[in-house]
Amino acid sequence: MSVENLVEVKNLKEYFNINTGVFTSKPLKAVDDVSFAIRKGETLGLVGESGCGKTTVGRTLLHLYKPTAGEIWFQGKKIETKQDILEYRKKTAMVFQDPYSSLNPRMTVSDIIGEPLDVHKMYADKSEMV
């Protein structure tokens, strides 16, 4: 992984077993061999038609789903152990497509972004958040 990359995903695969009968199943390839890198300061948007795997990529990237195969790197470190995942989740988040279920209109943007920072005690003083 390049040190310049904040996030790097290599050959990510996420397959789900779909029951095709009482005792049979077949794999559904929801994400198949996806690779990308995000440098510090960059923004990435996942765009595609409904059902193409955008949400699955996001959930797998956050380890909400265990990847079938592939590697996820964050700040030069491969995310693989339970401790890695816990530390990684403190520093990452997913914003879902529906802003009404993702963002509370009664909260300021600062409060929305600051809430997880408060929960994880990621700053000593509120002024550090800005």
Give a label for each model feature.
Residues 1-130:
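ABC transporter nucleotide-binding domains
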